[in-house]
Amino acid sequence: MSNELDYRPVMLLQNDINLKYSSPNDDEAWSKYLENPMTAATKAMMRANGDDDGVAALSLLYDYYRVPKEKRIITQGSTGRCDQVKRSCIEYDSDISTYDSTQLMRFLNDNNSSTHEYSETHKKNSYLSLDCLINPSKLPLSSGKLDNNAHDDFMATSCDVYEKNPLTTLFDPIHVPPPQQRWQPDSTFKEDTPEPLIFNDILRSQAESTCSEDYIPGEANRDFECTLESPKAIHIKSGESPMAYLNKGQFYPVNLRTAETRKCVHLTSNKVKSVVMVVFDNEKNPEEQLKRWKHWHSRQPTAKQRVIDVADYKENCNTVENIEEVAYNALSFVWNINEEAKIFIGINCLSTDFSSQKGVKGVPLNLQIDTYDFETGVKRLIHRAVCQIKIFCDKGAERKMRDEERKQFRRKGKSADQNNKDIKASVLPGYRGSDFTYLRPVTDMETHPVLFIPNIHYSNLQRCGVVLQSAADNSDRLSLKRSSQSFPESFEAPPSKQQTNEDPQRVLLYVRRETEEVFDALMLKTPDLKGLRNAISEKYELPEERICRVYKKCKRGILVNMDNNIIQHYSNHVAFLLDLTDVDGKIQVTLKEL
């Protein structure tokens, strides 16, 4: 039966759109099928092949054409054919209400609960609908050539009366209870549907701020926005600050700007001073924090290894000024609130560096940015923002992000299958989450951060052509720091590092005269010019007051005056040729570098 129906669709001739139909009506075409009604065996075979809709549709057509034609179609009048059909359906409504509707309700329930996923057999049956006769564009493309002559007499006449599918129009007035999904469609025959993005909750434009009302504490200052150009972690516990994954030693941009909806902040000028620091959670004991920093510092290859570094990029010089290394884990700079500031920072520690045990989970750190009124130094804190960071090595941040994306994909895929089985969840290829991590403003403006300054003397570096002051000379910053000397020495460095952490005030020089072959050691009690004079006086039994000039001659022949800075940083464990010259009763000392 179904094979015969497959040959009933209309074949449209492309050249003659006004071609008349050869068959007078559908009653004659269906009369021979009424003589052989569908049997239970035929229905069972069709249902076994998954063609429940076909069984219901054929049963409905059999019942429909058993009704006399006079009750189905009104005699043609002045109105159009489409209006006649609509009126005939209204008149026929009373007959439908009294009709035995077992097959009818079965068809409606199955039809309404379907998810528009059909097999190829269903698609063929759908082409029997009169909608395809009215709209030729809905017909499927044929793989073979059409022979117009062979099919001139093979035309259906259903659209001679109806404008659209009569089954839909006929049963519009019938009220059917809400359908329920009763069968699982075969996934093999699923049609392509628009695939939703599983990360649509985090796909946002850069201009949109992710700091929503429920994300920021109510009393937090929102005058400034601080962002870290690094992908934000997907899985974050509720109530925690956002987290970013970073690679050790890689530089990341940090952007600071004034929020568009900022309130009036009474600043003394348009400049503010921001301090970027890597700290532990401020709720932790300061002694415990310093103990961890000491443990990390003792395992570094050099005593001058810093926790946070700043890169000498052009973007830094154009947007910020007065970059200072406040501590080993902090740096400060000045920027204009009317312009967006950008600075590139790199972190030189791993999250697993703070424990001597292997296999211990890494300790998350906080990237904290404190902003002060520039004219008041660090006396007036006006904004504080924090985000969590985890530092990995060897591109570990990218691997961690990919792992989280796969977990998110599986979680979203399972939930999508449970809630809506006709939609396939997907993930954007190469998508790495949000490209920015917004630092969360906090309300705690009283807690002082623990900044790490080892027991060695270091000088601030010169950045962007600006000579920076020493950290000890800036009294405004003393309230910001917490030196390790303020706490008891509860940590001892390993023996391999104790020599590095010895008293840095001592400088050792190796000197000899040109006539000598063996060097003498000059131990300077103080790393300055006075200490050098005192050591030479004691070693060679010369009156210290007679030593007037001390020069250093470099390997390239440059003669420079020896000063405290050269002695402190460029003379320790260096070998020199000592030349003592008597000039007008005074002794002139020249150290030739070897």
From Swiss-Prot:
Residues 25-75, 28-91 are annotated as: Transcription activation. Its main location: nucleus. It comes from the Eukaryota. Pfam families: CP2, GRHL1_C. Residues 220-453 form the Grh/CP2 DB domain. GRHL genes (GRHL1, GRHL2 and GRHL3) show a paradoxal lack of redundancy despite their extensive sequence identity in the DNA-binding and protein dimerization domains and the fact that the core consensus DNA binding sites are identical. They have related but remarkably different functions during embryogenesis because of their differential spatiotemporal expression patterns during development. This is Grainyhead-like protein 3 homolog.
